[in-house]
């Protein structure tokens, strides 16, 4: 028989830097989950990733105080900013441009994000990433 699901917790946790401080501690604590167990498991799974890269995670809490978690791919905006070499997007995205992104960089980001995107193929995923970049005030070349 399957365990009874009590709820889902969605967080963005820096890779390799999960600790019991907020936002992790309070979110897991109010469901009665073992905070340190999650932190150790998450840090072990994100060991090979770039430290500090925000990783969205969905934690499924069960009635017996156990849990499972699923890690998603890093947010597209973070990957776009890193590839374009900018700190933040433009305050006026369609008038002030803050950086440029090549098609090759957009393809690399699309390949990384492919499991979480609803795009049918790589070209559609690249166009999705290009649209996100344009909304941040980043010019996309070759698309």
Curated annotation (Swiss-Prot):
SMART domains: RL11 (SM00649). It comes from the Bacteria. GO terms for biological process: translation. GO terms for molecular function: large ribosomal subunit rRNA binding; structural constituent of ribosome. SUPFAM superfamilies: Ribosomal L11/L12e N-terminal domain, Ribosomal protein L11, C-terminal domain. Keywords: Methylation, Ribonucleoprotein, Ribosomal protein, RNA-binding, rRNA-binding. InterPro entries: Ribosomal_uL11, Ribosomal_uL11_bac-typ, Ribosomal_uL11_C, Ribosomal_uL11_C_sf, Ribosomal_uL11_CS, Ribosomal_uL11_N, Ribosomal_uL11_N_sf. GO terms for cellular component: cytosolic large ribosomal subunit. PROSITE patterns: RIBOSOMAL_L11. One or more lysine residues are methylated. HAMAP family: Ribosomal_uL11. Part of the ribosomal stalk of the 50S ribosomal subunit. Interacts with L10 and the large rRNA to form the base of the stalk. L10 forms an elongated spine to which L12 dimers bind in a sequential fashion forming a multimeric L10(L12)X complex. Belongs to the universal ribosomal protein uL11 family. Forms part of the ribosomal stalk which helps the ribosome interact with GTP-bound translation factors. This is Large ribosomal subunit protein uL11.
